[in-house]
Amino acid sequence: MTNIALDLIGQSRLLFQHAAEAIGDTHEDALAFLRLEHEYHNALLVEQPNGNFADTVVRQYFYDAFNYLNYDALLKSEDEKLRAIAEKALKEVTYHRRWSSEWLIRLGDGTEESHAKAQTAVNLLWEYTGELFTPADFEQECIEKNISPNVAALRPAWLMHVSNILSQATLEMPSPDTWMQSGGKSGRHTEYLGYILADLQYMQRTYPEMQW
């Protein structure tokens, strides 16, 4: 899990650096550490708490399954740098998806307790998955310019992969048509993001522009 975290930090740095270059007059640390809560635009799924190990694995698997498809689609981006980032990241997220899916199968098809916890986590986190495939306003221009994929088009492949893994894990997949949470991509977050940002931003706000 530590290696996965390091991979995701590395991917984030590349994306923040690219965004800073496109915006101009800013840098990756400012984008990562100095924004206010409503200025972060992320899916609510990734700010859900770790909880127990089953919660962490299910959240990671749902995200990994999406991340793989997203980076694979970014290989066709009109943005040359995004294509390069995607090419590197795809190798990493392929491993991430394999790791989390194998652990989900172990938990679901394991003991009675691990199965129950895995099913509870699936049921709890499912309502946060729909937002992954709902384009936000800021994504529309990128979609129209073929900079990023239409995430809505990725959902059928995601559902197919998730259905297969949950079946192997002897877990029940909730209905794809159930009500879904949203708002994170528009800057409306759960209370959990505030705790994450308190840890994330502490050093940069206490010692601005500090260099290691």
How should each PLM-predicted stretch be described?
Residues 45-99:
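Internal, conserved structured core segments that host functional sites
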